[in-house]
Amino acid sequence: MLMRLLPLPSLTDGRPLGCCCTCQGSMKGDELKAQGPLPPQPLQGPLKGDKCEQPGLGPEPTAPQQHTEEEEALIEFHRSYRELFQFFCNNTTIHGAIRLVCSKHNRMKTAFWAVLWLCTFGMMYWQFALLFGEYFSYPVSLNINLNSDKLVFPAVTVCTLNPYRYKEIKEQLRELDRITQQTLFDLYNYNASSTLLAGARSRRSLADTLPYPLQRIPVQPEPRRARSSDPSSVRDNNPRVDRRDWRVGFQLCNQNKSDCFYQTSSSGVDGVREWYRFHYINILAQVADTSPRWEEETLGNFIFACRFNQAPCTQENYSHFHHPIYGNCYTFNNKNDSSLWMASMPGINNGLSLTLRTEQNDYIPLLSTVTGARVTVHGQDEPAFMDDGGFNLRPGVETSISMRKEALDRLGGSYGDCTQDGSDVPVQNLYPSKYTQQVCIHSCFQENMIKQCGCAYIFYPKPKGVEFCDYTNHSAWGYCYYKLQGAFSSDSLGCFNKCRKPCNVTIYKLSAGYSRWPSAASQDWIFQMLSLQNNYTISNKRNGVAKLNIYFKELNYRTNSESPSVTMVTLLSNLGSQWSLWFGSSVLSVVEMAEFMFDLLVITLLMLLRRFRSRYWSPGRGARAAREVACTPPPSLPSRFCAHSAFPTLTAPPPAYATLSACPPLQGLAGASSAACAPREP
C-alpha cells in the first residue's frame, strides 16, 4: 500500500493542521492514469489502512530526513565541570592526566594517580617559586677581564704640607701666635720666647683678645661600677689616656648662651692644635671673599725638577690651588691641560719624577707639626681630596710609587644601588667635577652646615650667595659645627645613605718603596747643582729635599664588570627544565593548562549568571513570550529548527475542529469522488 502525504498549513508551533491521505489498493496503472490525479482532501484525517481516523489521534508526521551539517559556533564551552575535566584529561599532552579518567572503575588507582599528580604539581610549582625568588633577588656575577693597552696617566697633586703666611693675614696670624705662646706658658709653663713675659700685656686675660680662650677643664671622676657576677663582663681594656685631673679645651655656646659644652682633647698637643686650627679658620674666612686671589708661590720654590717620560715638564702641565691646611698645591696632568700624558711603557723611567723642596721657612709651626710634602693620585675629572686619599713624603728619602689601574663597572637599577652621573642623588654637587661618592658626602655636609648654621665651612666649596663661617658674623658657628660633625660621624645626617656609589669607577692601586736620597757620596754635588739651578741655598741638606717617582708597574689593567646571574633566558630555561622533569611537557602543554583554567573560569561565571537570572529576573509577557515559546524546539529537534523565522505569528483563533465530520466509508476507489471528503462549513 502506498501513501502520499499532502502538507497542509501549520500552526505557529510548527505542527500541521491536518492531512488527507488517499488509499490505493489494487488499482491498475491504466486506471489510475485514466482517473487522473486526485484532488486534495482538505481537513480530513489520515487514513490508516482502509479507515479514516480523526485528526490528532494518529502519530504526528515527521519531517523528511535530510543530511545537513550543523554549524559550529565560534566559541563553545562545556556544559559542566565533569565534561570539561573529562575532555582535558583525554586530550592533554601532560603526562599522567589520562590516568585520572581511564581507571574510573578502579577507585584505588584513580585516587593514587590523583594524589601523585597533585604532589608532582605541587613540587613543580615549589621549584617555580624558588626560581622566581632567585630571579627577583637580582643576583650579579663579577666578571674579571685583563686588558693591555696604552694608559692615560692619572692626575697627581702635590702639596707643601704647611700653609704659607700670606700677606693678607700675616698680622692676624702673628697676633694669634703671640696669644698661643702666652697660653702655652700659662698652661704648661713653656716659654717659647725670651720676650714673652716682658710687659703687663702678657699678664692680661686671654678672654679680652679671643672669644674662645684655651683653658684647663677639670675632669669629673667616673663613678665606680658595681661588680657583676656575670662572667661575660670583663674589665675595660682601654684605659684613659690622660690620667690627670684636668684636660685642655675651649668652651663653645649657642647663640643665646643657653647651651654650652667643652671641646677637649686627651692630649695637650692635640688640644692646642685644634684650638689654633679653629681660630685659623676664622681668620681665613674673614679674608677669603675679600681677597681677589691668593698669591701663588712660584713652582720653582717648591719643585726643583719635574720630568715625565724623560722629558721636562712645562707650565701648561700643572695648575695651582690653595688648601687651608696643606698650603700650596700643584696638580699635574689635570683636565685643563691641552693634552693628557700617555704611558706607553711601564717602569720608573717612563713616569713622573719630581724633586721637591721640603724646607719650612716662614711657615706656621703650630698648625702643621710635620715636615715633607703630601701627594695624592686621582682621575683628571675628580677633585684632589688630600685628607682622604693622600699620604706624606718623607724628607731626604726617594719615594717610588708604582700604580695599577682597575676599572669597576656596576649594574644599576634593580641589580645594585649605584648612580650613573649623580643626577638622581638628592644632593647638589658643589664641586666643579664629575660625581663621586666623596664629592657627594662633602657636598651633603656643606648643605647641612648651611642649613643649620647659616654659613659655609671653609674647607668645602660653597654655593653662590653664602658666606664662610667666622665668629665675627656668626658667633655660634663653632658650637653648631662641632655638633654637626658629631652627627655626621654617626651618620645621623643620612649622607652615607643618600650618596650612592657611582656605577663606573676607575681606581689606582698604589704601592710605595723608599730609599735614602741622595746618598752620602752624591749629596754634595746634587745639592750644589740644585742650589745653582734654582738660585736658592739649601740650609739643611738632608731635611730640605725629597724625591718622588710615580709610574705604572705594568700596562695590564683589570676590568671588574658585573652581569646578571639570572637573566630572563636563564629563567625560562630553568622553568622549562622543571616542567619537563615533573610532567615531561612543553610550552604547548602550558598553553593547554592555561586554556583549561580559562574554561573553568568561564563555566563558573556562566553558572553564576544563570543562577542570578533564574532568581532575580523573569521574561516579559505578550508577543515576546509568544516568540520565546515558538522558538523553543521540541526535545527531539535541534535548536536550529525554529518556526518563528519561517512562519508569521498566529493572530486569529484556530479553526473549530469539532465541526469537521468524519469521512463516510469508501465504496470503491475507482468511483470515489473528491467531493465526498470535502469539508463542511461550520
Curated annotation (Swiss-Prot):
Query: Which residues are sugar-modified?
Result: 191, 504
Q: Which domain of life is it from?
A: Eukaryota
Q: Which residues lie on this side of the membrane: Cytoplasmic?
A: 1-111, 608-682
Instruction: State the reactions this protein catalyses.
Output: Na(+)(in) = Na(+)(out)
Gene Ontology BP terms: multicellular organismal-level water homeostasis; sodium ion homeostasis; sodium ion transmembrane transport
Cystine bridges: which residues?
159-329, 253-260, 306-313, 418-503, 440-480, 440-499, 444-495, 453-480, 453-503, 455-469
Q: Where are the residues of the annotated region Disordered?
A: 34-69, 221-240
Location within or outside the cell:
Apical cell membrane; Cell projection, Cilium; Cytoplasmic granule; Cytoplasm
Marked site positions, Cleavage by Furin: 204-205
What is the protein name for this chain?
Answer: Epithelial sodium channel subunit alpha
